[in-house]
Amino acid sequence: MQFSKMHGLGNDFMVVDAVTQNVYFSPELICRLANRHTGVGFDQLLVVEAPYDPELDFHYRIFNADGSEVAQCGNGARCFARFVRIKGLTNKREIKVSTQSGRMTLHVMDNEDVCVNMGEPEFEPQKVPFRAQKVEKTYIIRAMERTVLCGVVSMGNPHCVIQVEDIKTAEVESLGSVLEQHERFPERANIGFMQVVDRNTLHLRVFERGAGETQACGSGACAAVAVGISQGLLDRKVKVNLPGGSLSIEWKGTGNPLYMTGPAVHIYDGTIQL
């Protein structure tokens, strides 16, 4: 099986063309491939499939390193867009794809950065999903024998966003791992820790569902900005600084899609015996 290794701000991916190759990924195989000592090693596996709808270009599937399939990955979407162009699967700069959570439009810019239309943030608790009676800008969750204040939103996948004073000392591993599996998130959640620098800048670390802390999380950056804007902390265009680099996020508010722009890097191509 042929594959490419790519990364978006250090969030790394194994990308496979399932349009021209006949491949099947069991959870066991994915775990084996994800192993950084005995496999390829990655945060997520991205699979390019033929479209189910003639109006679209491709179907985009995402699997975590633990074998679970997820509906969204923003950094992966940027790599997906560059991969299909590098491999000659399309020469379009505007690429329309379906995912488990809906449709996305990916735009490859002249400098090879990719702008992704991530759709409109979803704050309705049942659609996140999150157990709550009604929409709130801030929720209170009990965890680790204390109360945690957070914003909750779906960007095609569930996110919990916590504001912190100092990103360096944020309890990403300890609190993140507890909240990821909290009973109020029936499908688990990605946990973001954001430090607001000013109205156009924030620092962010994310404990990703099924992957732990990663160098960057595109949908997590989108979620943090959506929550920050809804709470009145941020303006509509924000630079998000993650451990692996920076993303530009823009959202004009309710009724509008959110846009994420950032790099996607092709590292190498490989072949592996399955």
UniProtKB/Swiss-Prot annotation:
Lineage, opening ranks: Bacteria, Pseudomonadati, Pseudomonadota, Gammaproteobacteria, Enterobacterales
Organism: Proteus mirabilis (strain HI4320)
Any GO MF annotation of the entry: diaminopimelate epimerase activity
Keywords: Amino-acid biosynthesis, Cytoplasm, Isomerase, Lysine biosynthesis
Protein name stated in the entry: Diaminopimelate epimerase
Residues where substrate binds: 11, 44, 64, 74-75, 157, 190, 208-209, 218-219
Pathway in which the depicted protein is active: Amino-acid biosynthesis; L-lysine biosynthesis via DAP pathway; DL-2,6-diaminopimelate from LL-2,6-diaminopimelate: step 1/1
Cysteine pairs bridged by disulfides in the record: none
Keyword Cytoplasm assigned: yes
Assembly and oligomerization: Homodimer.
Catalytic activity: (2S,6S)-2,6-diaminopimelate = meso-2,6-diaminopimelate
HAMAP family membership: DAP_epimerase (MF_00197)
Family: Belongs to the diaminopimelate epimerase family.
Origin: domain of life: Bacteria
Enzyme class, UniProt record, top EC level: isomerase
Catalytic-site annotation from UniProt: 73, 217
PANTHER family referenced in this protein's UniProt entry, alphabetically: DIAMINOPIMELATE EPIMERASE (PTHR31689:SF0), DIAMINOPIMELATE EPIMERASE, CHLOROPLASTIC (PTHR31689)
Site (described: Important for dimerization): 268
Protein role: Catalyzes the stereoinversion of LL-2,6-diaminopimelate (L,L-DAP) to meso-diaminopimelate (meso-DAP), a precursor of L-lysine and an essential component of the bacterial peptidoglycan.
Localization terms from the record: Cytoplasm
Enzyme Commission number(s) of this protein: 5.1.1.7
PROSITE patterns for the chain: DAP_EPIMERASE
Record keyword Cytoplasm present: yes
GO CC terms in record: cytosol
Site (Could be important to modulate the pK values of the two catalytic cysteine residues): 159, 208
Example GO BP: lysine biosynthetic process via diaminopimelate
